[in-house]
Amino acid sequence: MSIHSVECNVGTNPITIETGKMARLADGAVVVRSGDTVVLVTVVSATKVKEGQTFFPLSVEYKEKAAAAGMFPGGYFKREGRPTEKEILTCRMTDRPLRPMFPKGYFYDTQVITLLLSADGENEPDILSINGASAACVVSDLPFAEPVGAVRVGRIDGQFVINPTNSQREHSQLDLVFAGTKDQVIMIEGSANELPEEDFIAALRVAQENVKVICEKQEELRAVCGKEKRAYELCLAKPELLEIGYEIAGDRIEEAIYAPSKVERQKKVGALRDEVEAAIKERHPEATDFDVEQVFEYIQKKAFRISIMEKDKRADGRALKQLRPLTAEVNVLPPVVHGSAMFARGETMSLCLATLAPMEERQYMDNYTGSVNEKRFILHYNFPPFSVGDTGRFGGQNRREIGHGALAERSIAPVVPGEQEFPYAIRVSSEIMESNGSTSMASVCAGTMSLLAAGVPLKRPVAGISVGLVTEQNDQHEITSYKTLLDIIGSEDFYGDMDFKLCGTSEGVTGYQLDL
């Protein structure tokens, strides 16, 4: 048994990454430790693509074991049960930086699993999970572009602290999770207590410097014990079908994708897609629906990016920095509802309902890692299928809904009055009425208004906005030019290079989430 390890000297406690001791039948496996917090992270990828597979089936699972904290699980059966909200948020946080590192068209079933084996109550395992997932992929035989590192940044007494302990976080003005490669940000997430813009930017720079150290250590580990990369095939648009697609749609795609309303745009695009499908299947009867979809998506994305970069032209006709029309209304429901508000930005609309209750109604949570175990301010986000004019599953929350709710909650939380000033439990329910991009930011705006309507003495109103990015790159994948978009719609999120959600008050930043 050959065991190899590296130590990353960043933050309050060094991070140790070890491989070769546990889970040796996985494609990649590492044990990551900081203080007495230990996680095992594994990755396994199938060697064949399932028939009919049309996307990259990456699943990321994170599980906290009660034994890790020397505790018994609650409940009658004394076993760990369904994922907690914290586990789901850690899954999302681990997933998002990994996904861009796999090649486009890699459709092999891939699973990353993180198990919390030991929790010391001070060092949070979420950062270890992200670093471990990257390291497991790096030492495996999977096609993984380059290492990803992650750190948490706090700001205590005016000084930035890398990977603060839970005790330190109680006194921090900032809670920033930053994941990236040696020279590029991939994901940021967190909250702040109305942090000034210049301090927020400085925190990002400090985070990038420390992430670089972690990435270099992962490269050292790969050089010593990394496996030879496997052979694989990519599912990409076929050139002969792409040629037919351009014959039919090349001169007409721009007219189809540019319309003031989402419904009109979908109708035009759908009709043109049907023409492309008919032409392709007439000449190539063996072509599948997925082949057609890849061709049309390629053409559509190319047209979108050319129009932004060369013409400054957006799908709904706005200028690059122009907001959609805003509408807002409070007390939209009878007074039996404590506070209600509706906020719409173009075709995105949130209806928020605020409820006050005695402190006994606060939420209590099982906690094995020493972080927050109760909340008196809760925001729940619900995304029914009718909000996009569709049918589908109704009831219960998926990971996306939990993630969006958490973003809106932590963005408003810094302005909620303390328990001594306002001794009530507070719940906001955001019901998405219409969706065409940035529903979480609409939830922040509507949620703030509903709280004010309910009589909650917020320090200041909070607002949120989304920012997009479209880039051009050279053969070395270096950005040569770019355009930023303000208040992005759904297609700009899908075809663009970035979705950056930023919330704050007139005094500073309160919440944020960025994905590339």
Q: What feature does the model see in each segment?
A:
Residues 133, 403-412, 424-453, 458-467:
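Extended, hydrophobic alpha-helical segments in both membrane/secreted and soluble proteins
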Residues 141-260, 451-516:
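Mobile "lid/hinge" segments at catalytic clefts and subdomain interfaces of large enzymes
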Residues 1-46, 50, 54, 233-372:
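Extended amphipathic alpha-helical scaffolds
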Residues 27-110, 116-123, 182, 189, ...:
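Glycine-rich, flexible beta-strand/loop modules in the N-terminal catalytic cores of phosphate-handling
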Residues 28-30, 38, 123-141, 329-354, ...:
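Conserved phosphate/anionic-ligand binding catalytic regions in large, soluble enzymes, centered on
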Residues 3-4, 8-13, 27, 38, ...:
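Alpha/propeptide regions of enzymes that mature by internal proteolysis
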Residues 104-110, 145-147, 214-232, 263-264, ...:
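Flexible, glycine/charged-enriched surface loops at secondary-structure junctions
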